[in-house]
Design a protein with these regions (language model features):
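Short S/T/G/P-rich N-terminal loop/turn motif that feeds into the first structured element of a domain
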Residues: 1-63, 73-91
Length: 91
């Protein structure tokens, strides 16, 4: 079942996001359906994604995202991820 995920990182910046994206590359990860990011209305940086499953999002997070943060020296505790089931999505 597809899931949506949101991360609001109050410490996030466009510069950090751009560095992470450059390191990860622009290829869609396995299980990734949709990705959007920008300044959070609460300050910091917000990412919203749709994944084929929460397990695929977790695999990407564990195997690629966290190692990228460490490589770039951004290895504080990651902000919490919020998941919910997707009933409908338009592309």
């Amino acid at each position: 079942m597809a899931v949506a995920m949101m991360v609001d990182n109050p410490e996030g910046t466009q510069e950090a996001y751009d560095a992470i994206r450059a390191h990860l590359g622009l290829q869609k990860p396995a299980g990734g359906i949709f990705h959007v990011a920008g300044p959070s209305p609460n300050g910091g940086w917000r990412v919203i994604e749709v994944w084929e499953s929460e397990q695929e999002a977790d695999t990407f997070f564990r195997e690629r995202f966290i190692p990228t943060l460490r490589t770039l020296g951004l290895a504080g505790p990651p902000p919490p991820r919020e998941f919910w089931p997707v009933h409908n999505a338009m592309q």
